[in-house]
Amino acid sequence: MHNENSVLRDAKESLFNPTPRKQGLPEDNTMTPYNGVRSIFDNSSDSHQLTDDHTHQERAISKAKLANENIAPFLAKHIPSQYAPLGTGISKSAGPPPRPDLKCRRQADEPSMDHLQWELQSLPQSDQQGIAHVWSLFSAAPAKQRELMLRGILAQCCFPQLSLISSSVRDLIRIDFITALPPEISFKILSYLDTASLCRAAQVSRGWKCLADDDVVWHRMCEQHIHRKCTKCGWGLPLLERKRLRASKEQIEKRALGVSVIPEASVTVQSVDATSGVKRTAEDLEASDSQTVKRQRLPIEEDTNIYKTNFRPWKDVYKDRFKVGTNWKYGRCSVKVFKGHTNGVMCLQFEDNILATGSYDTTIKIWDMETGEELRTLTGHTSGIRCLQFDETKLISGSIDRTLKVWNWRTGECISTYTGHLGGIIGLHFQNSILASGSTDKTVKIWNFEDKSTFLLRGHSDWVNAVRVDSCSRTVLSASDDCTVKLWDLDSKQCIRTFQGHVGQVQQVIPLPREFEFEEGHDASHEEDSNASVSGDESPSSQVSCSPTAAFFEGDRPAPPRYILTSALDSTIRLWETYTGRCLRTFFGHLEGVWALSADTLRIVSGAEDRMVKIWDPRTGKCERTFTGHSGPVTCVGLGDSCFVTGSEDCEVRIYSFKN
């Protein structure tokens, strides 16, 4: 026992007294401190190691007891909930001290820990105990003490050990920041990725997939590409049904900012599937509170499931639109031919799955675009039908017989007939309660269905082939055989601008959607026709500034559409800016006069006397594709997000579908 007591006394003094003792040293120097302190886990033996097995065993037991006695207070101080204090008098009911270091603690890597455990078990029991004590001390230490420990250890490392640390740390410091960050920040990061990168991100892990597939990210992707050209990648996808885009935009934007707005009552939104045309009803975001609240940080799966809706996921919408857009790009389409008219098809329009066609055979036919079935035939005109337009409730047609007829196209009943033109009606367009009609009598007639008033717009010197109403700005565009296009003010009943440049009869005029943005980089000055010009009404008071930033009208009255397209029998298509009257671009490619024209923000479709249909990029002027098949001049075209329809004097209607 004398030997054991002496060992304990020497060890305690070596641990807690940095000054080396100069008397009472035992004969062996196992516990002698180095530089004043020596580790209690140093199991090395010196040249004076005792050969007596019993004494060696007692010393080992003493070391273990001493180690436990000195480590226990440290562990009890920093992790009292896991390690009961020894004689400290600290109440277990007292809460543990704050541990800010736990917030940044990483999750253990299972394969690495298995390998570490295997290596530990290969060591002697005493070495295992010593290493376990070191790990316990470091694990219990707060951040500041950990830094001190690490600095001391690094100071004692040799180059091979430092190399091991360097190679290990390189992998350990990699952090899964996407799942570690709040969802709204992760959404913001992912929204900067392109489509391919976003799909690859979804393959990293379940957590990444949950975030990368979220509606917040893909809604932004749809907004960036659908019905417009992306400024980053140059891709544009076909138009999506607008109601759903608007209905979910506000909710998704608030989710992206980390704020949840819960409606007082669920909102039902009717939408038409962009690929199937089937009506769908969707509930708003699920919730139980009508207040605007700050979102709490939740686990990824729980957090995203709260915001599930009955809508089709935006990623699926984007995927379908991307397939259709790719088919448009490479010309992959299926063709259906509808036969039924006995004379040339002169006008058409389609919405969803319903197609209406008008012909010189004096009839209007209603078709099911999916099945090709002729649903009904509207009869009543006594001459060829040159123009028509329909909405959900009515169809209005114009004929060479000088009449306008209003139909219930669902039943085939003719509701009313309007007369007023002195010549055949060859162009019409209505929007809201305003109807405009163009005639061979060289006039444009405006019909107001609300107050039953009518008036004429005079100014063209030849047939008026096409008209276009913009009820927002209360203006009308008209195209005429006098080779001009005119812009009319419905309030003053005056022509406020005349566009001149075509050298053939102008057959069509259409405004481009307000979302369309002309790319100035493609605007080459040499492309502008030197013959193109703009003029105003003879009255000086009706002249309008040609500055692009100048308003057309005083006050808050909206300006007319900024860009318009025209086609003429001079075989060209022209893009105009209404603010300045400039012809921005001329599209060359057709061999004969262009009779038909349709466009959206992504493409232009034209049909001509040369029996060809061409697809154009409105920004660059490039002809992307040419379709043939008709045996007569193409007299009318219609454009949708995933198809276009053509009618010809060969009595056929052809549907080019890019869905499949």
UniProtKB/Swiss-Prot annotation:
Recorded family membership: Belongs to the WD repeat MET30/SCONB/SCON-2 family.
Gene: sconB
Chain intervals for the UniProt region annotation (Disordered): 1-34, 86-108, 521-553
Protein known as: Probable E3 ubiquitin ligase complex SCF subunit sconB
PROSITE patterns found in the cross-reference section: FBOX, WD_REPEATS_1, WD_REPEATS_2, WD_REPEATS_REGION
Function: Component of the SCF(sconB) E3 ubiquitin ligase complex involved in the regulation of sulfur metabolite repression, probably by mediating the inactivation or degradation of the metR transcription factor.
UniProt keywords, alphabetically: Repeat, Transcription, Transcription regulation, Ubl conjugation pathway, WD repeat
Keyword Repeat: yes
Organism, as annotated: Talaromyces marneffei (strain ATCC 18224 / CBS 334.59 / QM 7333) (Penicillium marneffei)
Coiled coil: none
Subunit structure of this chain's protein: Component of the SCF(sconB) E3 ubiquitin ligase complex.
Single GO BP term: protein ubiquitination
